[in-house]
């Protein structure tokens, strides 16, 4: 729970807070004439004051006696006040922004703290990458609570990453002050099949009395889900059906309702609350992955609260889901999540609950944003050289690098990955493709494109070959180093020449995302920090991503956030079929499968 303010622990300031509450000492700040959203009792308390001292709340109620000559008084003028919003599961890397720029982007929207899982940068740079992001966040007002990446690689043995994290590494990071728990345990097969590695990293977290966050994407909610939760996992953001979320809540697991740039699960999973008469204390709203144009256009948790209200969740319940519920999930409600005495003075002023319009944001008793604009400074952080040079490809990539051979054949029946727009899953399809000069041809008329994943961390020269369906592209290619979770170089296209151009464009700029057609680069987003992030401002990044979106449309793709859907093609912990730099993976059986179906 670190930021630029370094608020003192409660035990250091308890005497002062008690004195301020009784009027023996003046408060540093007092908010008057507010309508308090009390998340402890789910009610609005009219005409309430809040006295703040030493970055913490001293009193809630009538605070006239707490005002002295030097007290800063903020007149809420009848506006609502709520605890500052907490995002319980977020990959900052998905915003393509540095941590400091991410903070500048979300704090004015009422976000005061995030539970960051930096497993993207960890897959590239190891724990050094985690350290870099922690240091980047220390110069911001945003509270950066960090979880140690649990699955680096995501599924051991199926891909090549830049680093690996084991139980010994987790044990060491649990000593870091900034670490509050374990990042999403995606290797649920390892938990269910009792592997030493999976249970080892969970065990080291439990020994430290910290929170284990989860990732259980199976539709099975019986013995498998029970076994997963029994291992110590406390929450999960992978519910895509209402029954999934409800089953988790009934078993005492915090169900995190996701609404990001590409994954719009809230419409369905909100029914777990709206269609069932259940307590919502085990429900949390999170963003998971949010892109720069979404942050600029829609906002952050303020937008997600609004979406929850639109889906029928009561406004006060929605606010509980980004405040006290989240804090309790991470066993931090003694510090965060409510406007009550002793807690950190993280408060948002809301003009109305329907539109969730944030007018002021206070963090640790400091006014940090007003009317959508940050009012405090943020220190710039320069990422070290190893973070800025992460493209290590062994062989020069040419059109011939994309050949998929099938000798003495005219046609082959091929396993094809079919994407599901706006969903994380894929389908395995079997499609007959033509062979010309012993080379298997993609078939844009059937919406079947060629896909190749090149290892980019250790110059191993390994590459996985396959085909994908569902993007709708008739001509051109796209490439990305944002390719979960190993973040190798993923290239998809209709022809080898454009695919080579796309790959080499990213190698030259240090990583990123690109779309090309007929030998021309139509859209490019350079991401020089680990091939994942940029140090450019939000507005500039949003413009580049918007241009890339337009480039995707120009080459024939109309799905929402196509680069995010593309980025999940190598993620071998999600069903059904995936492609890593080692080959095709059946993610139901967790085994490699051949590209061709033998007759």
Curated annotation (Swiss-Prot):
Entry-linked Gene3D superfamilies: Metal-dependent hydrolases, Urease, subunit C, domain 1
GO MF term list: adenine deaminase activity
Enzyme class per UniProt: hydrolase
Keywords linked to the UniProt accession: Hydrolase, Manganese
EC number: 3.5.4.2
Lineage: Bacteria, Bacillati, Bacillota, Clostridia, Eubacteriales
SUPFAM superfamilies on file: Composite domain of metallo-dependent hydrolases (SSF51338), Metallo-dependent hydrolases (SSF51556)
Organism annotation: Clostridium botulinum (strain 657 / Type Ba4)
Keyword Hydrolase: yes
Pfam families: Adenine_deam_C, Amidohydro_1
tRNA-binding among keywords: no
One GO term (biological process): adenine catabolic process
Highest rank taxon of the organism: Bacteria
Originating gene: ade
Family: Belongs to the metallo-dependent hydrolases superfamily. Adenine deaminase family.
Co-factor(s): Mn(2+)
Name of the molecule in the record: Adenine deaminase
Reactions catalysed, as given in the entry: adenine + H2O + H(+) = hypoxanthine + NH4(+)
């Amino acid at each position: 729970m670190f930021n630029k303010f370094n608020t003192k622990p409660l035990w250091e300031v308890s005497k002062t807070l008690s004195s301020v509450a009784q009027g023996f000492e003046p408060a540093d700040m007092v908010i008057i004439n507010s309508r308090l959203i009390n998340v402890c009792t789910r009610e609005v308390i009219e005409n309430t004051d809040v006295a703040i001292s030493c970055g913490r709340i001293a009193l809630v109620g009538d605070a006239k006696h707490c005002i002295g000559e030097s007290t800063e008084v903020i007149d809420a003028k009848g506006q609502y006040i709520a605890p500052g919003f907490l995002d319980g599961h977020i990959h900052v890397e998905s915003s393509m922004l540095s941590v400091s720029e991410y903070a500048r982007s979300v704090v004015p929207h009422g976000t005061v703290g995030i539970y960051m899982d930096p497993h993207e940068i960890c897959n590239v740079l190891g724990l050094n990458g985690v350290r870099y992001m922690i240091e980047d966040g220390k110069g911001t007002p945003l509270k950066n609570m960090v979880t140690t990446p649990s699955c680096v690689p995501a599924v051991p043995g199926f891909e090549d990453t830049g680093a690996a994290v084991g139980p010994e590494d987790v044990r060491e990071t649990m000593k870091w002050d900034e670490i509050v728990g374990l990042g999403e345990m995606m290797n649920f097969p390892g938990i269910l099949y009792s592997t030493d590695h999976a249970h080892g990293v969970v065990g080291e977290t439990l020994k430290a009395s910290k929170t284990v966050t989860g990732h259980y994407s199976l539709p099975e909610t019986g013995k498998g889900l029970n076994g997963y939760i029994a291992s110590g996992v406390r929450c999960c953001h992978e519910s895509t059906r209402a029954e999934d979320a409800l089953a988790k809540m009934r078993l005492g697991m915090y169900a995190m309702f996701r609404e990001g740039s590409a994954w719009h699960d809230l419409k369905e999973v909100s029914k777990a609350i709206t269609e069932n008469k259940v307590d919502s204390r085990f429900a949390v709203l999170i963003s998971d992955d949010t892109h720069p144009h979404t942050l600029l256009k829609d906002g952050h948790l303020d937008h997600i609260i609004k979406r929850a209200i639109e889906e029928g969740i009561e406004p006060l319940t929605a606010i509980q889901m980004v405040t006290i519920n989240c804090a309790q999930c991470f066993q931090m409600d003694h510090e965060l999540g409510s406007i009550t005495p002793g807690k950190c003075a993280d408060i948002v002023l809301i003009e109305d609950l329907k539109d969730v319009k944030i007018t002021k944001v206070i963090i640790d008793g400091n006014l940090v944003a007003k009317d959508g604009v940050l009012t405090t400074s943020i220190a710039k952080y320069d990422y070290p050289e190893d973070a800025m040079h992460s493209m290590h490809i062994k062989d020069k990539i040419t059109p011939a690098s994309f050949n998929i051979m099938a000798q003495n054949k005219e046609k082959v029946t091929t396993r094809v990955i079919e994407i599901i727009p706006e969903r994380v899953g894929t389908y395995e399809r079997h499609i007959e493709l033509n062979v010309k000069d012993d080379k298997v041809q993609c078939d844009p008329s059937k919406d079947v494109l060629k896909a190749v994943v090149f290892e980019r961390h250790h110059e191993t020269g390994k590459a996985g070959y396959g085909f994908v369906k569902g993007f709708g592209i008739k001509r051109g290619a796209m490439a990305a180093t944002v390719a979960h979770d190993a973040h190798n170089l993923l290239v998809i296209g209709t022809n080898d020449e454009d695919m080579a151009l796309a790959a080499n464009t990213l190698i030259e700029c240090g990583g990123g995302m690109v779309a090309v057609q007929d030998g021309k680069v139509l859209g490019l987003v350079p991401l020089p920090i680990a091939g994942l992030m940029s140090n450019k401002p939000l507005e500039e990044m949003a413009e580049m991503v918007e241009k890339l979106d337009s480039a995707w449309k120009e080459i024939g793709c109309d799905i929402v956030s196509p680069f995010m859907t593309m980025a999940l093609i190598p993620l071998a912990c999600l069903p059904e079929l995936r492609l890593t730099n080692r080959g095709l993976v059946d993610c139901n059986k967790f085994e490699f499968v051949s590209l061709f179906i033998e007759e």
